[in-house]
Amino acid sequence: MGGNHSHKPPVFDENEEVNFDHFQILRAIGKGSFGKVCIVQKRDTKKMYAMKYMNKQKCIERDEVRNVFRELQIMQGLEHPFLVNLWYSFQDEEDMFMVVDLLLGGDLRYHLQQNVHFTEGTVKLYICELALALEYLQRYHIIHRDIKPDNILLDEHGHVHITDFNIATVVKGAERASSMAGTKPYMAPEVFQVYMDRGPGYSYPVDWWSLGITAYELLRGWRPYEIHSVTPIDEILNMFKVERVHYSSTWCKGMVALLRKLLTKDPESRVSSLHDIQSVPYLADMNWDAVFKKALMPGFVPNKGRLNCDPTFELEEMILESKPLHKKKKRLAKNRSRDGTKDSCPLNGHLQHCLETVREEFIIFNREKLRRQQGQGSQLLDTDSRGGGQAQSKLQDGCNNNLLTHTCTRGCSS
C-alpha cells in the first residue's frame, strides 16, 4: 500500500530575490576574518554551494563594512576557472550573505598542516593555474593583496582556486596602491617600503611575490624568510637587504630559476605577468590551453572520503555560537513579533543608523539571473570576453553597485 512519495523541489518565483529560505544549511566548514562559512544546498536546483555569512553589527563595530562591500563589488564582475566565483549575495536583519562555488578539497594551509608533500610537478601546475588567475585579475585592474596557502582552495580534482577578496583593491592606469595591506610573511618588499615612506607605491607585482613565497612554502614546508605577524617592519626590510634565500639542492634548476624570478626584490625586474612567466624556460613545455581547461591533472588529489577542513568548526557553530544559523528563522520571527512592543530593547541611535545604511546600500547579486538576462539579450553583450565582467557591467538589474560612501565609516559600539 506504500505510495510513491516523491519529494519535488520547491519552485521559486523567477522575479523573487534569492534569500536565506532558498537554501538548506548542511554544515559549518570554516571561518575567516570577516565571517563564517557553511555548506548549503539550493532548494530548487539542488546545487551545492559554500555560503559565507557576516554579522552586520559585528562588521559595523569592527569597521569592516566597507571591506565587505568592496569584496562584493569586485566579485560580482569576475568569473574564472581558477577563482572562487560569487553566485548570490543577499541580506537579512542580522547578516550579510555571499554564496560562492563549493570547493571541498580544502585550502593549501590545511594540507600543509596535514604534512602533505607537494611534488615539483604539482607545484609547477599550481603556479601556472594561479598565473592565469592573476593575469585575469590584472586585466580587470585588481590587486588581490593576500595570496597565501590559506586563500587557495582545491576542488575535488586538485585544481587551485583563489578566494577571499576582502582586502583586494582596484588600480587604474598608472595608479599605485599605497596602503599597508596583506599578511606579513607573504607581503612584497615594496609594500613595507611604502609604509616606511621609502617607496612610490605598489602594483600587480606584489601578488606575484606572494605566489613565489607560497610556491616555496609548498615545496619546502616553510617560508624563505623568518617573518611573522609580530616581526617589526624595519627588521623585515633589513632581512630583505641582508639575507639570501636558500633553495633546496634537490630541486631542479628550472624550478629554482622560476622561484628566483618570482622572489626578485625589485618589482620592475620581477616576473609579474602571464607573458613574463610563459617566457621562463622551465615552463616552455607547458600547454597553456590545457591548463586553462583543467585538462592537466595535479599530482595531489584531495581525499574524497573526508571533509578537508577542521571538524571543530561544526562544533563551534552548534555549541559556542550565540546566534547559530540553524535557529535563524525562529529567532528572526521572534524578534519581528517583539519589535514595537514594550519588551523591545532599542539599539543606540548611531548603531541603528549604521544598520539602516547597510541595509539600503548592500550589494544584491544573482549570477543565475544575470545568465538568464544574457541569454535573452545576448546581442547587447561583449562576447569577446572570456570572463563575465564586461557583460555583467552592462546588466545592472541583477546587482546593486553602491558602495558605503558617506556613513558608518567609523566603528560604533552597541
Swiss-Prot record:
Its cofactor is Mg(2+). It comes from the Eukaryota. ATP binds at I29, G30, K31, G32, S33, F34, G35, K36, V37, K52. Its EC number is 2.7.11.1. Residues 23-283 form the Protein kinase domain. It catalyses: L-seryl-[protein] + ATP = O-phospho-L-seryl-[protein] + ADP + H(+); L-threonyl-[protein] + ATP = O-phospho-L-threonyl-[protein] + ADP + H(+). Residues 374-396 are annotated as: Disordered. It holds the Pfam family Pkinase. GO terms for biological process: intracellular signal transduction. GO terms for molecular function: ATP binding; metal ion binding; protein serine kinase activity; protein serine/threonine kinase activity. Keywords: ATP-binding, Kinase, Magnesium, Metal-binding, Nucleotide-binding, Serine/threonine-protein kinase, Transferase. The active site is at D146. SUPFAM superfamilies: Protein kinase-like (PK-like). It is an enzyme of class 2 (transferase). Belongs to the protein kinase superfamily. Ser/Thr protein kinase family. This is Serine/threonine-protein kinase 32B.
